[in-house]
């Protein structure tokens, strides 16, 4: 990773949302480095119009403005591979923010090369995980990349000082109309929307119900359950209720339906990679449905030991993504194993959505390992000889019997 020399910085590619922080960063970079700023705005399904960012950038004299629809690439190449692993961090978090950063880092590096830029920049703070994710992703793809992280350099340490800077530099903040200003720091993409700050900084304070943007409260959800049939090919959803859909379309549809039924709300305290604990609230309707359904189809099609091995490796895989190592040898190795395991994960899962809960109520597959003739409680016509269990138990209990015969008390 190259060291920063301000005198050599002439062009900077900025990950730009058009919001307060990155608008101020754009101006700050222009003034501090006397450099040309090139903006990159990614549409990864945040649910807002990204085009207004163009007008905002133009108003600051920015000539090269990149606005790209990356929803399909994000869903297909990042979210879906992660869900083949059933990845969750610390038992609950579906990695919605973590998985979005590698793609943005990748495009930052690529655009920097296109423009022969000297540096890239982002709006992540010096306290969070995103700075790590952006910069590890960038250096993995371009070892000589120079990254400018203004939050680690400037003296604008509060929202008030940011607002003052914006006023002094004639930076218009609210380009989205008259929407009510949220007291929370929010980040959204196809997989989730996150909320931090405000009253959430007190881990005992319950989030206000009007905070949630994507879902109704389970209490207000419909009184009638909704059923969905999700069709899988090699571990990925390819159709919903018989309608073939692209990965990003799958997520849009499941977010809409799941949100209507109060699916996917989460309130957690997590351990950040940088060392502190952080309280966050998340809405992940599609991801919650996808995780439940994927485990449902795997239960039918995966060999027992393969399934158990996946479960053992999953926490390491999830931590790898959470900590920013998507572009790493270990993630690629784990992904190869995971993808191999999905070869026969084909079929249909039927799920029931009702007042915040997702239940698998049916599953079928031409690649099913479930053998009704063997598993039945009725007459199996000799398919399974129950006498075989006697020897199985005797051999598996042999070591325990030897322990007991030596007078060792295994009850304590």
UniProtKB/Swiss-Prot annotation:
<dbReference type="InterPro" id="IPR024074">
    <property type="entry name" value="AS_cat/multimer_dom_body"/>
</dbReference>
<feature type="binding site">
    <location>
        <position position="98"/>
    </location>
    <ligand>
        <name>L-citrulline</name>
    </ligand>
</feature>
<dbReference type="GO" id="GO:0004055">
    <property type="term" value="F:argininosuccinate synthase activity"/>
</dbReference>
<feature type="binding site">
    <location>
        <begin position="15"/>
        <end position="23"/>
    </location>
    <ligand>
        <name>ATP</name>
    </ligand>
</feature>
<feature type="binding site">
    <location>
        <position position="130"/>
    </location>
    <ligand>
        <name>L-aspartate</name>
    </ligand>
</feature>
<feature type="binding site">
    <location>
        <position position="282"/>
    </location>
    <ligand>
        <name>L-citrulline</name>
    </ligand>
</feature>
<dbReference type="InterPro" id="IPR023434">
    <property type="entry name" value="Arginosuc_synth_type_1_subfam"/>
</dbReference>
<feature type="binding site">
    <location>
        <position position="194"/>
    </location>
    <ligand>
        <name>L-citrulline</name>
    </ligand>
</feature>
<dbReference type="Pfam" id="PF00764">
    <property type="entry name" value="Arginosuc_synth"/>
</dbReference>
<keyword id="KW-0028">Amino-acid biosynthesis</keyword>
<feature type="binding site">
    <location>
        <position position="270"/>
    </location>
    <ligand>
        <name>L-citrulline</name>
    </ligand>
</feature>
<dbReference type="GO" id="GO:0000053">
    <property type="term" value="P:argininosuccinate metabolic process"/>
</dbReference>
<feature type="binding site">
    <location>
        <position position="133"/>
    </location>
    <ligand>
        <name>L-citrulline</name>
    </ligand>
</feature>
<feature type="binding site">
    <location>
        <position position="93"/>
    </location>
    <ligand>
        <name>L-citrulline</name>
    </ligand>
</feature>
<comment type="subunit">
    <text>Homotetramer.</text>
</comment>
<feature type="binding site">
    <location>
        <position position="125"/>
    </location>
    <ligand>
        <name>L-aspartate</name>
    </ligand>
</feature>
<keyword id="KW-0547">Nucleotide-binding</keyword>
<dbReference type="GO" id="GO:0005524">
    <property type="term" value="F:ATP binding"/>
</dbReference>
<dbReference type="Pfam" id="PF20979">
    <property type="entry name" value="Arginosuc_syn_C"/>
</dbReference>
<feature type="binding site">
    <location>
        <position position="129"/>
    </location>
    <ligand>
        <name>L-aspartate</name>
    </ligand>
</feature>
<feature type="binding site">
    <location>
        <position position="42"/>
    </location>
    <ligand>
        <name>ATP</name>
    </ligand>
</feature>
<dbReference type="InterPro" id="IPR001518">
    <property type="entry name" value="Arginosuc_synth"/>
</dbReference>
<feature type="binding site">
    <location>
        <position position="185"/>
    </location>
    <ligand>
        <name>L-citrulline</name>
    </ligand>
</feature>
<keyword id="KW-0055">Arginine biosynthesis</keyword>
<dbReference type="GO" id="GO:0006526">
    <property type="term" value="P:L-arginine biosynthetic process"/>
</dbReference>
<dbReference type="GO" id="GO:0005737">
    <property type="term" value="C:cytoplasm"/>
</dbReference>
<dbReference type="GO" id="GO:0000050">
    <property type="term" value="P:urea cycle"/>
</dbReference>
<protein>
    <recommendedName>
        <fullName>Argininosuccinate synthase</fullName>
        <ecNumber>6.3.4.5</ecNumber>
    </recommendedName>
</protein>
<dbReference type="InterPro" id="IPR014729">
    <property type="entry name" value="Rossmann-like_a/b/a_fold"/>
</dbReference>
<dbReference type="InterPro" id="IPR048267">
    <property type="entry name" value="Arginosuc_syn_N"/>
</dbReference>
<feature type="binding site">
    <location>
        <position position="123"/>
    </location>
    <ligand>
        <name>ATP</name>
    </ligand>
</feature>
<dbReference type="InterPro" id="IPR048268">
    <property type="entry name" value="Arginosuc_syn_C"/>
</dbReference>
<comment type="similarity">
    <text>Belongs to the argininosuccinate synthase family. Type 1 subfamily.</text>
</comment>
<keyword id="KW-0436">Ligase</keyword>
<keyword id="KW-0067">ATP-binding</keyword>
<keyword id="KW-0963">Cytoplasm</keyword>
<dbReference type="InterPro" id="IPR018223">
    <property type="entry name" value="Arginosuc_synth_CS"/>
</dbReference>
<feature type="binding site">
    <location>
        <position position="129"/>
    </location>
    <ligand>
        <name>L-citrulline</name>
    </ligand>
</feature>
<comment type="pathway">
    <text>Amino-acid biosynthesis; L-arginine biosynthesis; L-arginine from L-ornithine and carbamoyl phosphate: step 2/3.</text>
</comment>
């Amino acid at each position: 990773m190259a060291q920063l020399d301000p005198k050599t910085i002439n062009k900077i590619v900025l990950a730009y949302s058009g919001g307060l922080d990155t608008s101020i960063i754009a101006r700050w970079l222009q003034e501090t480095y006397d450099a040309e700023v090139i903006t990159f705005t990614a549409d990864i399904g945040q649910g807002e119009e990204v085009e207004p960012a163009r007008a905002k950038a133009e108003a600051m004299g920015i000539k090269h403005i990149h606005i790209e629809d990356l929803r399909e690439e994000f869903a297909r190449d990042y979210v879906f591979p992660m869900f083949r692993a059933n990845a969750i961090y610390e038992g609950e978090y579906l990695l919605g923010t973590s998985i979005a950063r590698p793609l943005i880092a990748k495009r930052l590096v690529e655009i920097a090369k296109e423009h022969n830029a000297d540096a890239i920049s982002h709006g992540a703070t010096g306290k969070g995980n995103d700075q790590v994710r952006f910069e590890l992703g960038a250096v993995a793809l371009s070892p000589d990349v120079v990254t400018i992280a203004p939050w680690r350099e400037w003296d604008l340490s509060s929202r008030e000082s940011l607002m003052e800077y914006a006023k002094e530099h004639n930076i218009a903040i609210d380009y989205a109309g008259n929407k009510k200003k949220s007291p929370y720091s929010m980040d959204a993409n196809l997989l989730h929307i996150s909320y931090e700050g405000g009253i959430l900084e007190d881990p005992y304070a319950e989030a206000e119900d009007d905070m949630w943007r994507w879902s109704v409260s389970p209490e207000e959800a419909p009184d009638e359950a909704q059923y969905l049939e999700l069709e899988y090919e090699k571990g990925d959803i390819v159709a919903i209720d018989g309608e073939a859909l692209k990965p990003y379309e799958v997520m849009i549809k499941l977010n809409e339906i799941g949100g209507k039924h109060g699916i996917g709300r989460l309130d957690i305290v997590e351990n950040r990679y940088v060392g502190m604990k952080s309280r966050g609230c998340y809405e992940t309707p599609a991801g919650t449905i996808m995780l439940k359904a994927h485990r449902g189809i795997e239960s039918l099609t995966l060999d027992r030991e393969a399934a158990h091995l996946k479960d053992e490796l999953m926490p390491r895989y999830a931590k790898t993504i959470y900590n920013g190592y998507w572009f790493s040898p270990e993630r690629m190795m784990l992904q190869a194993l995971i993808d191999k395991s999905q070869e026969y994960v084909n079929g249909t899962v039927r799920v029931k959505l009702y007042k915040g809960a997702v239940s698998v109520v049916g599953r079928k597959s031409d690649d099913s390992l479930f053998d009704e003739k063997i598993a039945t409680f009725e007459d199996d016509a000799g398919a399974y000889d129950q006498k075989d269990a006697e020897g199985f138990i005797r051999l598996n209990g042999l070591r325990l019997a030897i322990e007991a015969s030596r007078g060792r008390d295994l009850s304590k």
